[in-house]
């Protein structure tokens, strides 16, 4: 997947330099959103509304993707990436600030070459207008990631709150979109998961939820070792390769690998069908949901976010666990298991 930034450009982008040199006489003048000329040369042009930029930084002028010449320039580049380098996917940065016309023409141009190419948009809010089949295949699912993290950050939230926010995320879009949403818990633009999580147990619990949800789970580099980091740029620390090679994070990496392996090899974890049985409703901080397939098999996920032991009868096949001992799910415990409807009925008797 290549990252395409078509919302804005850098200061040394040749067309922008041509505009700075020639002003309105530049053939590229209309490539940008310039409201007034000449521009303030003290770095305050965008704050004076003389031109539109990304983040009010004068060195990142916004591109006018309503301009046919701009659209052709960047779409031709994308076509070249697909034809020459056979890329599998493209991510559009700040996608909600790129024109719909650009997104539609990009979709048509590269899907003609490779119908299976994955077009991903970086949009932080509800993105239904971009997900009607003629622009993006998916967006970065920040609402889901925030819903998961919020449950661990705000201890006053209950399993009913969790159920509501998860269901809200998955009723916002059509099923075929939910199947391919780009699910994440942290990125280069957010605090890292381990920094938000109070401890490693909370970190693993949130990953267990991530790998159980419909869509395409993604982990940010460093998340596999529980790397910490605050807001940008702290979230973009270098990987501690020396410590990794010395085995310092071996156990963490193995646990994350186990979850990834489980996601890949357990079809039910990829299922779009899930529900919340509420068998543990008396424990407001215990999450329980089940992934359901076509047959009678079910994968059940139970996570004890409370401060007390929870009795969870043994049944089925354990796929992944932390702090599950003798039918007791300890505080911060995780249980992922495969059960059948028959075994569930026997257990409920």
What name fits each language-model region?
Residues 8, 73-100, 183, 187:
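Active-site groove signature of glycoside hydrolases
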Residues 308-324:
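Beta-strand-rich binding/interaction modules
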Residues 133-134, 179-186, 191-201, 207-247:
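Aromatic/acidic polysaccharide-binding cleft in carbohydrate-active enzymes
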Residues 1-80, 84, 106, 112:
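Substrate-binding/active-site clefts of carbohydrate-active enzymes
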Residues 57-71, 88-97, 151-156, 189-198:
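The substrate-binding groove and active-site-proximal loops of carbohydrate-active enzymes
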Residues 220, 228-229, 235-299, 306:
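Glycan-recognition and catalytic regions of carbohydrate-active enzymes
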Residues 13-20, 79, 83, 93-176, ...:
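Active-site-proximal helices and loops of the catalytic beta/alpha 8
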Residues 325-349:
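C-terminal beta-strand-rich structural cap/linker in extracellular carbohydrate-active enzymes
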């Amino acid at each position: 997947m290549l990252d395409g930034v078509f919302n804005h450009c850098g200061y040394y982008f040749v067309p922008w330099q041509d505009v700075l040199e020639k002003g309105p006489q530049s053939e590229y003048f209309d490539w940008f959103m310039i409201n007034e000329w000449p521009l303030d040369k003290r770095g305050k042009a965008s704050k004076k509304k003389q031109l539109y930029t990304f983040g009010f930084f004068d060195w990142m002028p916004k591109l006018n993707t309503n301009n046919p010449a701009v659209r052709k320039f960047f779409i031709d580049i994308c076509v070249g990436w697909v034809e020459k380098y056979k890329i599998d996917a493209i991510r559009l940065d700040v996608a909600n600030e790129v024109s719909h016309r650009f997104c539609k023409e990009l979709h048509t141009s590269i899907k003609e070459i490779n119908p299976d190419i994955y077009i991903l948009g970086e949009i932080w809010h509800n993105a239904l207008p971009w997900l009607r089949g003629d622009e993006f295949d998916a967006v970065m699912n920040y609402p889901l990631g925030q819903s998961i993290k919020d449950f661990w950050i705000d201890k006053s939230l209950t399993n009913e709150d969790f159920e509501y926010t998860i269901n809200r995320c998955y009723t916002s879009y059509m099923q075929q979109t939910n199947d391919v949403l780009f699910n994440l818990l942290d990125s280069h633009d957010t605090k890292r998961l381990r920094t938000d999580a109070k401890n490693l147990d909370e970190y693993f619990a949130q990953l267990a939820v991530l790998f159980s949800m419909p869509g395409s789970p993604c982990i940010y580099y460093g998340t596999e070792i529980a790397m910490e980091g605050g807001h940008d740029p702290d979230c973009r620390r270098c990987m501690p390769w020396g410590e990794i090679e010395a085995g310092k994070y071996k156990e963490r990496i193995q646990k994350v690998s186990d979850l990834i392996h489980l996601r890949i090899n357990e079809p039910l974890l990829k299922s779009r069908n899930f529900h919340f049985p509420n068998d543990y409703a008396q424990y407001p901080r215990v999450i329980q949901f089940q992934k359901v397939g076509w047959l009678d098999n079910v994968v059940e996920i139970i996570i004890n976010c409370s401060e007390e032991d929870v009795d969870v009868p043994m049944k089925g096949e354990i796929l992944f666990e932390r702090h599950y001992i003798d039918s007791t799910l300890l505080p911060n415990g995780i249980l992922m298991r495969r059960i059948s409807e028959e075994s569930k009925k026997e257990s409920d008797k």
